C-alpha cells in the first residue's frame, strides 16, 4: 500500500461518493457519464482530489476518489455539482425535459470513507495499546 504525502504528513484518504439525479430521473447514459467524469477530473486538482474509479447507472453515479487532509470535500462536491449541472444541460439540452425546474442533481449525496483496516480492528488496536507494552519512559 503506497501512502500519499505532503510536507508534514503521510496519509491515504479514499472516499466513495454517490450522487443522484433529482427525483432519480433516468438521464445518465455512457456519453453523459463521460461528460460528468470529465468535469469531475477538471475541477478535482483544485481541491487536491484524484479520481480512481467512476461508474454510473441511469439515475446516479459512483465515484471512488483520493483526497488530502487539506481537501475541502464538501466545497468540492458543491462546486462540482453546480458546474456539472450547468455543463450537462448545455451539452445535452434534450435532458432538460426530464428535469424538475432545471435541477440536475439532488441536493443530497452520500459520502463514505473507505480503505484501511475495518473500524473494529482499529478500535481493538487502540484499546490494547497500553497492554503488555514495555515501559518507554527514560
Residue ranges of predicted features:
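Basic nucleic-acid-binding interfaces
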Residues: 1-138
Amino acid at each position: 500500500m503506497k501512502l500519499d504525502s505532503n510536507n508534514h504528513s503521510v496519509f491515504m484518504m479514499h472516499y466513495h461518493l454517490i450522487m443522484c439525479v433529482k427525483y432519480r430521473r433516468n438521464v445518465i447514459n455512457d456519453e453523459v457519464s463521460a461528460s460528468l467524469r470529465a468535469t469531475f477530473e477538471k475541477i478535482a486538482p483544485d481541491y487536491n482530489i484524484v479520481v480512481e474509479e467512476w461508474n454510473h447507472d441511469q439515475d446516479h453515479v459512483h465515484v471512488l476518489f483520493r483526497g488530502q487532509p487539506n481537501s475541502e470535500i464538501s466545497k468540492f462536491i458543491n462546486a462540482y455539482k453546480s458546474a456539472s449541472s450547468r455543463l450537462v444541460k448545455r451539452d445535452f439540452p434534450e435532458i432538460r425535459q426530464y428535469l424538475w425546474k432545471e435541477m440536475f442533481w439532488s441536493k443530497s449525496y452520500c459520502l463514505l470513507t473507505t480503505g484501511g483496516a475495518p473500524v473494529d480492528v482499529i478500535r481493538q488496536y487502540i484499546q490494547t495499546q497500553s497492554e503488555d507494552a514495555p515501559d518507554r519512559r527514560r
